[in-house]
């Protein structure tokens, strides 16, 4: 029995390693824009929420390479400044300071404090943006909370719905004027394939009656898509586009609230190494939607791996999208 078990484990391990080898030989990281496009985003200002780690950090690095002025909107200023310093050393020549938007090299990094779990923080951040920034070419709603235990935001909202949907809903609405005055401009929303397992229960949006952390995450990601589609409808004719994406399964710290048994962790780590995307790979669709001429004027669409994908009918329900918008306006205080 022991010999058989060992043989099975070795076979499974061999299979994983073989698949991993195929994956890395066939799909090493391919940056969307090579040297000839290194200045594609020069002169443009991009705001990325949650840019100090994971997908957000990788997205910031790619856009910095393309010459953008990148504003990192992050909850923890100290961690964000540390990440910004690392990015400057990685991307900017000779580890020096930012080259600046007009230097012909890498772009510029700016750190601003933004806590999406606090509507007052969102308002203060937007006020600072409107006072200090003359333009905003791209807004990337990237920050997120993933399957956390039940907790509430500063304003009393279930954390995942509050941060992933409501915080970004208010942020986007307060910055729309700046985006319109900077047009043509773009909004990029990071959702997830897990939206498929969510539903919008208008009777219990705050999960007061029951809480399932997986379902609530999926619901918040479905809300991201419905928000995108309704916003695209409202922005028709403004030269401001908005699209939504799923990054795939990515190796980030987003899953820090998920408990993996100690004995299973080595296998999980091996599987994630073999099959999950790196943050750099996962960031490519966001970079594509933020910068590529191929999607100029495209709005209200859902993308994965830099290609448009189909949505389930529940993610295209216009009546649900409008109702969610109306309720969200009240929840964040845009309408009383």
UniProtKB/Swiss-Prot annotation:
InterPro entries: NAD(P)-bd_dom_sf (IPR036291), SDR_fam (IPR002347). It catalyses: all-trans-retinol + NADP(+) = all-trans-retinal + NADPH + H(+); 11-cis-retinol + NADP(+) = 11-cis-retinal + NADPH + H(+); 9-cis-retinol + NADP(+) = 9-cis-retinal + NADPH + H(+). The modification Phosphothreonine is found at residue 5. It comes from the Eukaryota. GO terms for cellular component: cytosol; endoplasmic reticulum; nucleoplasm; photoreceptor outer segment. One of its GO terms (molecular function) is 11-cis-retinol dehydrogenase activity. NADP(+) binds at residues 48-54. Its EC number is 1.1.1.300. One of its GO terms (biological process) is retinol metabolic process. Substrate binds at residue 177. Keywords: Lipid metabolism, NADP, Oxidoreductase, Phosphoprotein. The active site is at residue 217. It is an enzyme of class 1 (oxidoreductase). Pathway: Cofactor metabolism; retinol metabolism. Signal peptide: none annotated. Retinol dehydrogenase with a clear preference for NADP. Displays high activity towards 9-cis, 11-cis and all-trans-retinol. Shows a very weak activity towards 13-cis-retinol. Has no activity towards steroid. Shows clear specificity for the pro-S hydrogen on C4 of NADPH and the pro-R hydrogen on C15 of retinols. Belongs to the short-chain dehydrogenases/reductases (SDR) family. This is Retinol dehydrogenase 14. It comes from Bos taurus. The lineage of its organism: Eukaryota, Metazoa, Chordata, Craniata, Vertebrata.
